[in-house]
Amino acid sequence: KALSQTEPNLIIEFTEFDWGGDYYRKNGIMMPEDGVEMLKSYDSIYFGSAGDPDIPDHITLWGLRLKICQGLDQYANLRPVKLLPGISSPLKNVKEKDIDWSFIRENSEGEYSGIGGRSHKGYSHDTSMDVTLFTRHGVERIQKYAFEIARSRPRKLLTLVTKSNAQRHGMVMWDEIFAEVSQDYRDVTTDKMLVDAMTTRMVLDPKSIDTVVASNLHADILTDLAASLSGSMGIAPTGNLDPDKRHPSMFEPIHGSAFDIMGKGIANPIGSYWSSVMMLESLGEVNASKRLMLAIEKLTSEKKVLPRDLGGESSTQDITTAMIDIITGKNK
């Protein structure tokens, strides 16, 4: 809202939906049955977090966030990772330029396809099954998107992460399709890593990494590690994208609801701000996007107003006020 007040050509209209834990307590569902249809008329979606200490996690996730992502076919999850000015990595001798990554996560199928079941619950032969589903269509389109992202970055380096030594069907297909798609992107340098080895590489040789593409589960885990290596989970943004622009994309910080600090006013809002940067860029508001990113970098580089997870003592409201002051020019 502060940006729209200082950008003469930026007009943003907000509609807020009360979907989530409180809505579930009243209605027995996380969002209306026609909620996905309601969202289709909007240009973009700005998401807070899904979770409630009194509601099982699988209900809050599948009833809201995943329902939106899959319902709007937001098949590409883009997660930029960067060491912001003034922020220290827990890794030794890591410079700002050493962590500048772009993770692309398959966001529509794979380990989170939702296929499976459970029987004989409560008996000794209680049985459950979750099915990992990979389709050529799904794998090919996310890999092509990842190649496009890698091509747009200065280093033009793309790493494929799988576990094809142990997962000998679906992950082998990932490897095979990657080899095929790479033929159309000969200007992009490629390499492959097993997911367990990738965690070691991220810690021991972070500057060797640029753009990474992985399955739904693997990228979900790797990007939590990536966020922590860049300073804090509270910094990291993400975009759930429909690159084909048939439906609106959705932007959110990657962290969950953080029940242990809920209501204390100490949450780190930087991930939410950075998600707004991504949203504005996707809407074509390049100038506003750049201004907001510069404001974030000014905030972190000055180190005057920082949340507790970044070594400061400022409240969420203090940080928000400081950001507004930077954007509106009150903080010169």
Regions found by a protein language model. Name each.
Residues 9-14, 153-162, 185-193, 285-291, ...:
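Flexible, glycine/charged-enriched surface loops at secondary-structure junctions
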Residues 9-33, 200-202:
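N-terminal beta-loop-helix "entrance" segment that forms/cooperates
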Residues 20, 86, 193-200:
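Short acidic loop-to-helix transition motifs that present clustered carboxylates
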Residues 21-24, 78, 201-304:
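Glycine-rich phosphate/nucleotide-binding loop
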Residues 25-129, 217:
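N-terminal glycine-rich phosphate/adenylate-binding segment common to multiple enzyme folds
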Residues 314-332:
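Phosphate-binding loop/pocket of nucleotide- and phosphate-handling active sites
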Residues 1-7, 123-195, 208:
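Glycine-rich phosphate/diphosphate-binding loop of Rossmann-like nucleotide-binding domains
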